[in-house]
Amino acid sequence: MSQSNNVTDLARANIRALTPYMSARRLGGNGDVWLNANEYPLGTEYQLTTQTFNRYPECQPKHVIERYAAYAGLPPEQVLVSRGADEGIELLIRAFCEPGQDAILFCPPTYGMYAVSAETFGVERRTVPAQADWQLDLPAIANNLDQVKVIYVCSPNNPTGNLINPADLQAVLALAQGRAIVAIDEAYIEFCPQASVSNWLKDYPNLVILRTLSKAFALAGLRCGFTLANSDIIQLLLKVIAPYPLSTPVADIAAQALSPKGIEQMRQRVSEVRANRAWLQSALQDCACVEQVFTSESNYLLARFTASSSVFNALWDQGIILRDQNKQPGLANCLRITIGTRQECERVIAALAPLPGIDNSNNIDNQSKTHSQTSSIRKGTI
């Protein structure tokens, strides 16, 4: 056995077997129209106001916390800032789940980092597939809460774009009361702010809300997210977060983005994205290769195609990079399209328009069977 193999064998067994989250950048591509990561299509400009970098930053930069708290309508003690919402996902597992004993629960098709974070810490991943309309299966959730410490619900859901029914969210919070944390992932909430549940925090001590500056604030490269919760939970998370989660430049830019001017600019971007989303949704429905375009409350559209692999490759060859969702339960022949500029949306339609429609009844039949088979509860223990 080679020396390198010996070193690899020192790693934990679950890490050796782990399939990492395949981010858009990790998947690569050589395109010039990047519509696969739900980013804002244009760069934002900021000037650093702090030029002193020889000192460590604050663990929780006061200016950032206060500005986000004001934006969210919460007291500062209910806000924690982290390296993206992904770190918030991980912090909840680190704080609440005993490896090899506890579980998290989530409802696919949904965001993949819930599963990866649990795998990394040796925590069971318990899945309760969403119903055919992508709403929560409440009876199945109720029957699978043993040893569950954290329930993740994404609303608007990635990659489907739909909001979860508020009454169902309240039902899950009630089911989990005294048993589990319910983390509502609101990464895309700026595109439908009326649907936020942040005003529920006063009524549900087990509610946690995850937020980010990556989407509507157009700062995906900054890696800055927020966890909103009651102060007791925030204090627990502060015990497990890194001592300096935000660098000084990141905190500087985040504070600028959360200024009154920054928030006004964010809302202007949201209006532009909504207009382009409406245009793209209408145009997609006229393409022969498109079977269905699903309603979205976010900055992307999910569409089912007659032959998604051919469509994906055809656009890839033209420098238009989409996100393939075929491996997600219930999403056979589906691609997710980030809303880009109007020009980028027009390029997508120009590339799709010549592609033929195909009789895909067999594929849809198979899709229905697959969804039916996955409706039973699946458990994965790491």
Curated annotation (Swiss-Prot):
<dbReference type="GO" id="GO:0004400">
    <property type="term" value="F:histidinol-phosphate transaminase activity"/>
</dbReference>
<dbReference type="InterPro" id="IPR005861">
    <property type="entry name" value="HisP_aminotrans"/>
</dbReference>
<keyword id="KW-0368">Histidine biosynthesis</keyword>
<dbReference type="InterPro" id="IPR015421">
    <property type="entry name" value="PyrdxlP-dep_Trfase_major"/>
</dbReference>
<dbReference type="InterPro" id="IPR015422">
    <property type="entry name" value="PyrdxlP-dep_Trfase_small"/>
</dbReference>
<dbReference type="InterPro" id="IPR001917">
    <property type="entry name" value="Aminotrans_II_pyridoxalP_BS"/>
</dbReference>
<dbReference type="Pfam" id="PF00155">
    <property type="entry name" value="Aminotran_1_2"/>
</dbReference>
<keyword id="KW-0032">Aminotransferase</keyword>
<protein>
    <recommendedName>
        <fullName>Histidinol-phosphate aminotransferase</fullName>
        <ecNumber>2.6.1.9</ecNumber>
    </recommendedName>
</protein>
<comment type="pathway">
    <text>Amino-acid biosynthesis; L-histidine biosynthesis; L-histidine from 5-phospho-alpha-D-ribose 1-diphosphate: step 7/9.</text>
</comment>
<dbReference type="InterPro" id="IPR004839">
    <property type="entry name" value="Aminotransferase_I/II_large"/>
</dbReference>
<keyword id="KW-0028">Amino-acid biosynthesis</keyword>
<comment type="subunit">
    <text>Homodimer.</text>
</comment>
<dbReference type="GO" id="GO:0030170">
    <property type="term" value="F:pyridoxal phosphate binding"/>
</dbReference>
<dbReference type="GO" id="GO:0000105">
    <property type="term" value="P:L-histidine biosynthetic process"/>
</dbReference>
<feature type="modified residue" description="N6-(pyridoxal phosphate)lysine">
    <location>
        <position position="215"/>
    </location>
</feature>
<keyword id="KW-0808">Transferase</keyword>
<comment type="similarity">
    <text>Belongs to the class-II pyridoxal-phosphate-dependent aminotransferase family. Histidinol-phosphate aminotransferase subfamily.</text>
</comment>
<feature type="region of interest" description="Disordered">
    <location>
        <begin position="360"/>
        <end position="382"/>
    </location>
</feature>
<keyword id="KW-0663">Pyridoxal phosphate</keyword>
<dbReference type="InterPro" id="IPR015424">
    <property type="entry name" value="PyrdxlP-dep_Trfase"/>
</dbReference>
